Amino acid sequence: MNITGIQSDWKVEKIEFARLTGERARSAGANGRIGIHGKSCSVDIARITIDGQTGYGSSIHMTPEWAEDIIGRRLLDLFDDRGRLREAYRLQLEYPVFDWLGKRLDKPVYDFVSGAHMERGVPLVVPCYDTSLYFDDLHLPDERSAVALMQEEAMQGYAKGQRHFKIKVGRGGRHMPLWEGTKRDIAIVRGISEVAGPSGKIMIDANNAYNLNLTKEVLEALADVNLYWLEEAFHEDEALYEDLKEWLRQRGQNVLIADGEGLASPHLIEWATRGRVDVLQYDIIWPGFTHWMELGDKLDAHGLRSAPHCYGNAYGIYASGHLSAAVRNFEFVEYDDITIEGMDVSGYRIENGEIHIPATPGFGIVFDDELVTNLVKRSGWS
């Protein structure tokens, strides 16, 4: 990233912290690991003031004592010689700092992080998928009703511009008897593929609720479905992924293997470079945007694909779109339909399975200054 425009006298003057709250458009049910996720969501936000101007962004692992130590530091000193934000400041401040930089430079973030693959001066439009299809059917005793309910949820997304869908599977791993749950997984994926149509891409995510042979059973049953990737079928294991990749190759079934969200194996990237995994999915909030720019360079060099995980953090959804400008083999923005009070994302829009990223300065998200100020006083800190 080019930081030559950062002036040496720009200093951090103030850091404020608040938690904004909101709701999903629809309550989210269970997945293969845990129970109902619900409707409520929150975003921890930092507002940074540098040279009299503010920037907003997601912030984690920040304490008042840590922030106090940053006050008075030069913005330039937060970056290393490569123009990357130093590791010590990333999780706490990378988003508000990048938002501030965009506003000061009068550029969207994607403009000043973009790689050589990006065409300048054209709107940034990025593929996205609806990630809201959880186990909302567990209360229904029969498969037909379950499929109808999940199809209706997919149609809600379709009506809002979504064309690609990720479907939670693994009902038999915890919440239903094994074969009954697996059979329902298959039926629901088939039903939602009808909603998506032949051009819609379908992803399935088991949250590690399958094993190798169960994975093969499901993939064989879905061989005629436009299945794009399989995510977290089981806990990462190179030997099992090698077996699965060879099995898919012998069948001529072109399904990508995706993994990396959560507490992934530290060897996962190494396995991916050896052809065991196709799509890496580390989270956009942790380890974050700058980490992803560095990782994306490495994955691009090996012909691997990037699809940052983002669920439950509304800020990360929109930040992911900007990251696509820095990573050539960026696949999708993971989209969860969330409204956060005081966070205006109306500059973004979804059409035909793509999210249109606004060309406004910073991340293009408008925060309610007065609301944030009140939250800082009432329940946050400065």
Role assignments for model-derived ranges:
Residues N2-I202, A209, K216-D224, V345-S382:
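N-terminal capping/lid subdomain adjacent to the active-site entrance of alpha/beta enzymes
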Residues R19-T21, M62, W286, Y311-Y315, ...:
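Glycine-rich beta-alpha junction loops
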Residues P96-K103, D297-K298, G321-A325:
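Short glycine/serine- and small hydrophobic-enriched flexible loop segments
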Residues K107, L304, N329:
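Short glycine/serine/threonine/alanine-rich loop segments
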Residues H175-I317, I350:
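Catalytic core of soluble alpha/beta enzymes
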Residues Y282, A325-N329, K377:
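Short, well-ordered loop/turn and helix-capping segments at boundaries between secondary-structure elements
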Residues N313-A314, Y318-N352, G362:
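Active-site pocket-lining/capping segments in soluble small-molecule metabolic enzymes
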